[in-house]
Design a protein with these regions (language model features):
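Long, charge-dense, solvent-exposed interaction surfaces that engage phosphate-rich ligands
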Residues: 162-196
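Clamp-loader machinery-focused feature within the broader ASCE/P-loop NTPase space
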Residues: 1-127
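Hydrophobic residues in beta-strands of the RecA-like P-loop NTPase core, especially within AAA+ ATPase
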Residues: 29, 118, 132-133, 149
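Short regulatory helix/loop adjacent to the ATP-binding pocket of P-loop NTPases
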Residues: 127-136, 151-164, 181
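Conserved catalytic/switch belt of AAA+ P-loop NTPases
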Residues: 104, 130-147
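Active-site catalytic microenvironments for nucleophilic, acid-base chemistry
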Residues: 47-51, 135-138, 179
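A generic "binding-loop/recognition-motif" signal
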Residues: 120, 151-152, 172
Length: 196
């Protein structure tokens, strides 16, 4: 199993509950910005796809996941404002309404769960947050919301109360070194500099 360095326990807990159909429909993944929360979630979904498809057409599924085009996975993040050509300050209510439709649709792939990744839930404006709350109050079976948050204190308490909370701590030096070495950064001085 492809486990994210430093977060094996959290990964295994979520994955085992997912494959046993005992996972809460809403999962809040929190931790400092830049520690790999999105990477954690996408690797979790990757392992789920491998497990649930018994490796049938897995290259196709993984290619779709990598390109953000998988029909069972939606990523919600700040969009580009077409008028200004700049990234919007918030995730809007219209974006949340679109994922509501997605969450209610029947899966295009039989027996395969659907995933909605909100990166980052901290960027929901108040109308979007309230709309998301209504969706989370009536979860659809086999649809999972992963809310990524750098500052959970910014989220509505009522949203947080509906989520399984998983905190990913900042990596210790050993895990940090392992990540860099796995990415072919092996110079000790560089590793120490980047860690500090």
């Amino acid at each position: 199993m492809n486990i994210v360095i430093g977060y094996n326990d959290q990964f295994n807990y979520i994955f085992n509950n997912l494959k046993n159909d005992t996972l809460n429909n809403s999962i809040l993944i929190s931790g400092n910005k830049g520690i790999g929360k999105y990477f954690f979630v996408t690797n979790l979904i990757k392992e789920y796809l491998i497990y649930s498809t018994n490796n049938k057409n897995i290259k196709h599924h993984l290619s779709l996941l990598k390109n953000n085009t998988h029909s069972n996975i939606k990523v919600l993040k700040k969009e580009i404002d077409l008028k200004t050509n700049k990234i919007k300050n918030f995730i809007t209510i219209d974006q949340v309404r679109n994922i509501n439709f997605f969450s209610r649709e029947t899966s295009q792939i039989a027996n395969l769960a659907k995933f909605i990744i909100i990166d980052s839930a901290d960027n929901l404006n108040s109308n979007a947050a309230n709309s998301l709350l209504k969706i989370l109050e009536e979860p659809k079976k086999n649809t999972y919301f992963f809310l990524i948050s750098h500052q959970p204190s910014l989220l509505l308490p009522s949203i947080k109360s509906r989520c399984l909370k998983i905190n990913l701590p900042t990596h210790n030096f050993s895990d940090f070194s392992e990540i860099l070495i796995s990415n072919n950064i092996t110079d000790d001085e560089t590793i120490k500099f980047l860690f500090d």
